[in-house]
């Protein structure tokens, strides 16, 4: 049987308001009374309901986390950083999987608000215009972390995809690449646009043109990478930039199955740098996003908003670096 605040109050022979003050750390309670209430709480194994506590403190110490695909290793690495900081600041998280579905995402967002969470954080994916409106109207702070879609009005944490693309393109041109393709998906549309901006800028400066820009129909998966290679097979570029590691590995394996040498005949680089990049042979060259830090800094930024701390910069850009491994020359 569930123990309630009423049971604790009755056993300790105090009012429910007194129990609530003890639970919420209110100092306006005599030490003797506080000790008696805490003894009863321990003996009855009472677990205060977060929402019930929130009625007194106006805080539930819970945050809502919206993830596009919880099974994707990219998002799990973001979530790890977030969880560690949430625990450090004594917040509990309610993690919800949106399945990359904008309608489900809206439903989850409103459901989290109804649960009286203190804040909401988006991990990865793309923020739609409709979602931006909901965020701007939200009654609680919202942070987007590792999420595609720059918006000066929404607090965010990410890397600069455009600058990363410029660096990569310049390096690959120096290594002899003259033709390029870009592979991404609908769920990373904004990141793809940012990469495309940097890629085309450097190509134009060098008098080169972009070949294929392929949008995968679904999530950025291994299978979609295989499909992308099949579309390009008759007219392969010298280098392919992939938004996700899984797409890049799908392309690499397809190329090798077709007898194409990587990186001698085809160079491949990705923008995720999940653990997968070192599990394949040759190891995958990639932009190193500090995934753990993106999740951790996003959560810390949210705690600042929730606790009315001073915000130095609402749009945090973390440094990236590029690791050239076995899929580039």
Swiss-Prot record:
Task: Tell whether Transcription is among the UniProt keywords.
Answer: yes
* Domain HTH lacI-type stretches: 1-57
Q: Per the UniProt record, which residue ranges are transmembrane?
A: none
Gene Ontology MF terms: DNA-binding transcription factor activity; transcription cis-regulatory region binding
The entry's DNA-binding region: 5-24
Where does this protein have coiled-coil stretches?
A: none
Instruction: For this UniProt record, give its keywords in alphabetical order, as a comma-separated list.
Output: Activator, DNA-binding, Repressor, Transcription, Transcription regulation
Record keyword Transcription regulation present: yes
Stored NCBIfam families: ccpA
What the protein does?
Global transcriptional regulator of carbon catabolite repression (CCR) and carbon catabolite activation (CCA), which ensures optimal energy usage under diverse conditions.
The protein in question is named Catabolite control protein A
């Amino acid at each position: 049987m569930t123990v309630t605040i009423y049971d604790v109050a009755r056993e300790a022979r105090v009012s429910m308001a007194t129990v609530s003050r003890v639970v919420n750390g209110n100092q306006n309670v005599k030490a003797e009374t506080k000790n008696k209430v805490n003894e009863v709480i321990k003996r009855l194994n009472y677990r205060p309901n977060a929402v019930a506590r929130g009625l007194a403190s106006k805080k539930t110490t819970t945050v809502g986390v919206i993830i596009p695909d919880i099974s994707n290793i990219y998002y799990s690495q973001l979530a790890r950083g977030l969880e560690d900081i949430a625990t450090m600041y004594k917040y509990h998280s309610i993690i919800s999987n949106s399945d990359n579905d904008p309608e489900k995402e809206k439903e989850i967002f409103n459901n989290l608000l109804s649960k009286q969470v203190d804040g909401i954080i988006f991990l990865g994916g793309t923020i739609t215009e409709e979602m931006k409106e909901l965020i701007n109207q939200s009654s609680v702070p919202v942070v987007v972390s590792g999420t595609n879609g720059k918006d000066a009005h929404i607090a965010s944490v990410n890397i600069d995809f455009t600058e990363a693309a410029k660096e990569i393109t310049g390096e690959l041109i120096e290594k002899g690449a003259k033709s390029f393709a870009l592979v991404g998906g609908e769920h990373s549309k904004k990141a793809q646009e940012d990469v495309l901006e940097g890629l085309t800028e450097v190509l134009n400066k060098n008098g080169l043109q972009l070949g294929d820009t392929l949008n995968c129909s679904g999530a950025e998966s291994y299978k979609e990478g295989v499909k992308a290679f099949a579309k390009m097979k008759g007219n392969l570029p010298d280098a392919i930039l992939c938004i996700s590691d899984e797409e890049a590995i799908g392309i690499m394996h397809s190329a090798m199955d077709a007898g194409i040498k990587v990186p001698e005949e085809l160079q491949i680089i990705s923008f995720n740098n999940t653990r997968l990049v070192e599990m394949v042979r040759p190891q995958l060259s990639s932009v190193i996003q500090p995934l753990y830090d993106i999740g951790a800094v996003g959560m810390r930024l949210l705690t600042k908003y929730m606790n009315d701390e001073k915000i130095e910069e609402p749009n945090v850009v973390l440094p990236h670096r590029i690791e050239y491994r076995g899929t580039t020359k």
